Amino acid sequence: VVAYFQPVTRVVIDQVRGVDSAHSLALLLDRELGLMTLRRAVVRPGSRAMEFIKAACEDAYDRLIYPSLEREARSDLTDAACEGAIANFGLNLKPLLMQPPVKGHVTMGLDPGYAHGCKVAVIDGTGRVLDTAVVYPTYGPRQKQEAIDRLSRLVRRHGVTHIAIGNGTASRETEQMAVELIRQLGGGVSYMMVNEAGASVYSASKLAAEEFPEYDVNLRSAVSIARRMQDPLAELVKIDPKAIGVGQYQHDMPQKRLDETLSGVVEDCVNAVGVDVNTASASLLGRVSGLNAATAKNIVKYREENGAFTGRRQLLKVPKLGPKAFQQSAGFLRVPESKSVLDNTGVHPESYAAAEGLLALCGYTLADVSAGRLADLPQKVKALGWEETAARLDIGVPTLRDVAAELMKPGRDIRDELPKPILRTDVLEMKDLKPGMVLTGTVRNVIDFGVFVDIGVHQDGLVHISQVSQKFIKHPSEVVSVGDIVQVVVLEVDEKKKRIGLSMKQVPKA
């Protein structure tokens, strides 16, 4: 039995959840102080019943008051821990959804496995499936070379430039096969390890069966892994956020509260990026503010029956998508094929008049927006005065700034401004790691006691919270988020226990 003592005011989330799971939390109060306080309140000195009331106080304290205080303290701590864990889950989920896409490349997805082999799917730059296969690189040297030969033919046939490898079972052997494949091809191809959490859940879902009725469950997961590299957000919205694997103690939390928080995070991310109504799936459209699963399916059905949308206003022809839903969703829906460039921006139709007025005031036209000739727009608005210009256009200054930003980059994807994912052509082994080595890695998970970083080895390394920053922090999320590209220095390597200790604060300054 291990005794652990900590003041209630200083207990942190993971300690509360850990203690809760062991059902061993005990509140330690000063009994004499509690009894003295109780006696002062109810015992009248000199009373004939004084001794009886004192005894009653002791009984009440031991049998009723103390257990009640303990339950209340435990409940308050657990509630606070749940709220903190839910908030942490949301903090981790957002950057995972907002990972920069690797767009427009023919991509090969590899879903590693032993008994059932490695499932392979090749998709084009739009996510359309071109080819599938199953290879068995773990069955022996001959089968491994046969797998490499088959993948090599697929790479050459379809012009594959990127390989996405799931990070689950047999991923180490699959990564080694991919590196050997790239070597035998003579370059021109790079790979990335992809978090495959939830891929198996999606592949066995009704949604996946509707999307890929002709493919086996295992091949669907390979397609999902490839698409996660091309556009993480569009693929991950198809999966229950709880299955993505970036939280702590999610099964112990109030599920309704957790679902509400995570759904809000997903919706915020989808709205921030924007959705192309002519290519988006119903799953993605259903996450846009103002739309639901039914209206999203109606948009896809209308698109299939009538061809691509040619303007935002055309959305009003979609069954069950009324004026209110249009008002709420229009600003987040993009129509690149529209004759009006404003339909491919985040400018809401209600602000089109203001946008055109702003262009006129600054000597521009919509043609200049399409051609990207608005580099001097902020300077021209500044010369006119932001508040004065907003007043002339009858909008607020924040709206004016948003409109100006959208006009300068029509069709922009805010994820493109984030650090690019790390693409590799070679693999590191744990035995290659030495204390003092400085490496670049990708943050895979942020939890209460530290940060897990993918440094290109099969095992993620841990940066303990004490090694995250030179300054004191209460939580690693104050410094890093999931998906961040960070520099780390190797502190220790334990091959037997498969543990890698890393530090961010000890990285030598350039």
Which residues does each PLM region occupy?
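Basic amphipathic alpha-helical segments that dock to polyanions
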Residues: 2, 25-28
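Phosphate- and other anionic-substrate recognition elements at nucleic-acid/protein interfaces
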Residues: 84-97, 103-106, 115-263
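Short amphipathic alpha-helical interaction segments
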Residues: 16-26, 293
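Single-stranded RNA-binding regions, centering on S1/OB-family and related RNA-binding modules
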Residues: 335-339, 343-510
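Extended, highly charged clamp/arch subdomains and adjacent linkers
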Residues: 27-106, 125, 148-153, 157
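Short acidic, hydrophobic short linear motifs in intrinsically disordered regions
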Residues: 5-16
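Long, highly charged, low-complexity intrinsically disordered interaction regions
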Residues: 210-308, 325-355, 359, 397-425, ...
